[in-house]
């Protein structure tokens, strides 16, 4: 329903829609095209809305909530994007906990949108009510319980910034069922102009042209040159920053072998003569001895 035109920097169309469609519009703005999910009572309005967005999203339904979160996690790792998944309240949300914990431990960016009982029933031990924000507090970078429609757009935007900045990880957004159904005005400008804290858009302030940094880099190069048996120990940050090729070129240039953490597997071709494999409890005896 076209609700009117609003003047900002330019005229923009304002549309009246329910909270479920607003969430999907926000996901479109984030460039999301794949969603993992499993339907349930609290997220039925979200799935009703998803039907109208079948051309915008590929929805993959798993047979269990734990599977959908692991799938979203795997998708995030393989595509280097944010994985997105839907789960219902109560048992649906608790079933997702193992997958959320895995993504947290492995620094995998993910946004989990869970359904919740209506706001009027919160805290009343309602059917399939669980304090999922409390339950996942120790295994998410941040989590949110959306209390009203005004919080919906900024919460979704902030969730993606938190998940995909600094050390990446999962974020949970818990949305009561009545907010999926509540009508509100929305335009693309709402999302674009939504203000979030500066620290959410983390960017390294490392400047290669800075004299101090150049000095530090030269000192590091000298230390490497003087080393008798240097080893590069590479982790998951290499993959998440798309730096595998740079790592391989660097290792080749200084003729130094590369050891990987568990999350760093795949940083360098295993057939490369400089690839030693992995250290730690899952590594080989030879790999472990290389750092002793």
Model-found features: residue ranges?
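N-terminal alpha/beta PP-like core and its mobile active-site loop of ThDP/TPP-dependent enzymes
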Residues: 13-292
